[in-house]
Amino acid sequence: MTYQHIYNIIKKKAYFDAHQAVLIAVSGGVDSMNLLHFLHAFQAKLQIRIGIAHVNHKQRPESDDEEAYLRSWAKKHAIPIYVAYFQGAFSENAARHLRYQFFEEIMQQEHYSALVTAHHADDQAETILMRLIRGSRLRHLAGIREVQPFANGQLIRPFLTVSKAELPNPFHFEDHSNDSMAYFRNRVRHHYLPDFKRENPQATQSLIDLSAESRLLLQAFDDLTKGLEFHRLNCFLAQSAAVQFFLLQHYLETFPQLAIKKSQFDDLLHIIRRQKQGIYPIKNTYCLLIEKESFAIKKIIPKTDLNREFKMVSYGDSLNYRGYRFVFSGSLTDKGHDIAIPLYSLSPVTLRHRQAGDRLFLGEFSKKLRRLFIDGKFTSEQRQNAIVGEQAGVIIFVLVGDETYLRKASKHDIMLAKLYIDKLEKR
């Protein structure tokens, strides 16, 4: 396929109609060099001016050669170029974070309204297969979007409907790390996807079609629920369980820094359905706030009293909290610990102060903590310093004075782990 054919496809989609200054992410590989040559050749017809953004990851001997070539090319064609350098311990996630942070900074500083990357149809198919293997949610099977908000403008992927085989072969640098089986994407590209294509020669297109259909399904759901006041508990709970599930998923998508596991999602949904007022920590200083008539996810401001109200310990982790050390362990051996709390779930354990209305299930009945403290003849100071532990919004233990009260387990519960508690002054 020639650049003219690609231009004809892209022009119909009007990617650049709202943009004048476009920043191109260029690595020096064949895909990004195709993008650079294409946009340089057609910038007048598209009525845009272009700039180059390049990140030298300093991981290969060729990295400096790639940078030098791109600088020379940019100078020859009078195109501005911006270069960043990776420092510190290298990982794919860290490198990606640096790249997009750098792109965002350049867009804002140099007034570019669009970032353009060279993702193509094969990248889309690989991404969908990777997410299927990882067990991603349906929402994430929608794959890579052609256009999405980014920084002060948009991120555009104009080659996303074009296969790699349809692109020309301009001068480019080969990144031999693309052949390393140490990377998941390379294993998908060189092994897993070819195996699928031997079974079904149209496997790549089938994955792309799955992505498009998933995107349409999600768009239909969003259209049908638009304007729904789902933050109001009576509105949320009036929906079917299936609609509640996707409403909460959609809401969580508005918090990109809050990537939670499926088990945590199930816990949040369970807490909302119980309608018990309170503050439930999630992660990264985010919490679920349930009030009398509504719920919301909030980011807690550091150094506030609210932030000191609770801590959360996850499976395999430990932390110190108000004079005690808490260890969430899969080991069921109690030896050497002051207290051992049996756990029948691997959900994170929230440690907090008592709240008005707190109840502990004791078997055939439950008791308010206020009454529990009165019956136990605990002092006002002991009541104030009591530690409440809960999972998924259910209190599982109360530590007050020298006593520990446990939630009565069901006969069907299976112990999966223990929470070990030790007084710090013993350490």
UniProtKB/Swiss-Prot annotation:
The keyword Ligase applies. Its EC number is 6.3.4.19. GO terms for biological process: tRNA modification. It is an enzyme of class 6 (ligase). ATP binds at residues 27-32. CDD domains: TilS_N. Signal peptide: none annotated. It is found in: Cytoplasm. GO terms for molecular function: ATP binding; tRNA(Ile)-lysidine synthase activity. It holds the Pfam family ATP_bind_3. The keyword Ligase applies. It catalyses: cytidine(34) in tRNA(Ile2) + L-lysine + ATP = lysidine(34) in tRNA(Ile2) + AMP + diphosphate + H(+). Its main location: cytoplasm. The N-terminal region contains the highly conserved SGGXDS motif, predicted to be a P-loop motif involved in ATP binding. Belongs to the tRNA(Ile)-lysidine synthase family. Ligates lysine onto the cytidine present at position 34 of the AUA codon-specific tRNA(Ile) that contains the anticodon CAU, in an ATP-dependent manner. Cytidine is converted to lysidine, thus changing the amino acid specificity of the tRNA from methionine to isoleucine. This is tRNA(Ile)-lysidine synthase. It comes from Streptococcus equi subsp. equi (strain 4047). The lineage of its organism: Bacteria, Bacillati, Bacillota, Bacilli, Lactobacillales.
